[in-house]
Amino acid sequence: MNMLYFVLALLVGLAGGFFVGQARGRQQRATLDDQLQREARAEAERIRTQADAEARQLREQAEQRLQDAARRLQEADDRERQVTLQLEAQREQLQAVRAQIEAERARAAQDAARERETLSADRQETRREREELKREIERLNRRAEQLDARGDKLDALEERLEGQLHALAQQEAELAERSRQVDLKLYEVAGLTPEAAREQILRQLDAELEEEKAIRVKAMTERATAEARRTARNVIAQAIQRSASETSSQMSVSVVPIPNDAMKGRLIGREGRNIRAFEALTGVDLIIDDTPEAVILSSFNPVRREVARHVLEALVADGRIHPTRIEEMVHKAQDEMKSFIHAQGEEAAIESGVVGLKPGLVQLLGRMYFRSSYGQNVLKHSVQVAHLTGIMADELGLDAALARRAGLMHDIGKSIDREIEGTHVEIGINLAKRFGEPPEVIDAIAHHHDPENGETLYSVLVAAADAISAARPGARREELEAYVRRLEQLEQIAIAFPGVQQAYAIQAGREVRVLVQPEKVTDAQATLLAREIAGRIEQDMEYPGQVQVTVVRESRAVEVAR
């Protein structure tokens, strides 16, 4: 029992100790927890305080950075506004300078156009004066030759008359006595003085001699003309029937089509750089106006204009239009043009049957492809002249190859007459001498406009072929005003002669038909009148080919039967 109490007491003691230990442990733990919590709160407060301080410091740094950024942004805005103002001022200044440059360019273009017009007018005036002087010299040369021929005839006549003077001297005494008796008889019969009777007889004799002279001149002229015309017709007919060529010539075009009007802006380029580069590289004015789907190329040099046309067509087809591309296309087109010109010269030489030409002459021949005279292509004209000259030379038994060479080369000076001072004849002579052409070719070049002064027959053949090729209908064109003025001048020259009733220019100015008053002009005098009118036309006018003068004298007798 005691044991039980002891055990119970022990258990109670153990239980009490356990509970007491537990209570004390809880108290200690509570105390420790409170201490830990206070330390944790203190540490948290310290961390919070330190974090707040760091946050304030970071906030202040951020605010400082924001202020710095705002200040820098403000400074950048200020600088941007300042630069914008400067750019605006510079842009306005550039626009003003550009406007001034455009105005100066327009003035310069106008001045250049006026200068070109003045130079063209001066050149035409100089050329006209030179042609007039040349015609005057030719007329004086013909007059001198006529006087020389007349002097020879007079010398022969003088020799013949000297032989007759001796016989006439013997008859002089008899004639004097007979004349005295005739005068006395006339005085007795007609009641006239010897002086009056002599004057009447002389007037009658002059009229008879004038009539006889006109009849003889007419007969001799008709006989010589018929013979020469028969021979010339035979030779020329043989040449013409073996030659054929087109009647219209190809003209150099200066209008280039474009696909649409938007292409005009691309051709001009930004601030006009494309058109400036194009004009500077080609030497051709590019005119862009309101013409729909087309632009115009303007230049006095046909070769440069043709190069510019090829360049422009290539640029439009390619679509890449800028100064570098323009320069590439110009160089390419120039090389192609040189090859094309040389090929044209070789083709003309082969077509004409002329061999052995030097490359320089072939190149000059090719340049004539772009040269025209009164609308007629000079190269095709030269080829046709070569054919005609060769055919006529063959008919006359001359060297046909040399004749073709002279015909092909007769206008070689026209290939560069717009670049070198002088007439195409002078330039052609110098070129032929430089390239070592035969003397016959040089003589044909020098005298294909005045064959009567030539030293060989080839100059006459070339002049005839030149006239045939140039004067045939449709070969050349001329201005309407000049054509009408030429017809009026032909009629006025004919009407100015006494005895002319009316005159008409027909067949495009190649014939003048003159109606005369039959009571004032006899049949014999009509021949002399036609010759005088033709001489006046040759002296006072310029005309292609020949002008035929036809004098018509018509006598009518009217009576009424009643």
From Swiss-Prot:
Gene3D superfamilies: Hypothetical protein af1432. Residues 108-129 are annotated as: Disordered. The chain crosses the membrane at residues 1-21. The keyword RNA-binding applies. GO terms for biological process: mRNA catabolic process. InterPro entries: HD/PDEase_dom, HD_domain, HDIG_dom, KH_dom, KH_dom_type_1, KH_dom_type_1_sf, Ribonuclease_Y, RNase_Y_N. It is an enzyme of class 3 (hydrolase). Its EC number is 3.1.-.-. Keywords: Cell membrane, Endonuclease, Hydrolase, Membrane, Nuclease, RNA-binding, Transmembrane, Transmembrane helix. Residues 378-471 form the HD domain. Its main location: membrane. One of its GO terms (cellular component) is plasma membrane. CDD domains: HDc, KH-I_RNaseY. It is found in: Cell membrane. PROSITE patterns: HD (PS51831), KH_TYPE_1 (PS50084). It is a single-pass membrane protein. One of its GO terms (molecular function) is RNA binding. Residues 252-312 form the KH domain. It comes from the Bacteria. Endoribonuclease that initiates mRNA decay. Belongs to the RNase Y family. PANTHER family: RIBONUCLEASE Y. This is Ribonuclease Y. It comes from Deinococcus geothermalis (strain DSM 11300 / CIP 105573 / AG-3a). The lineage of its organism: Bacteria, Thermotogati, Deinococcota, Deinococci, Deinococcales. The gene is rny.
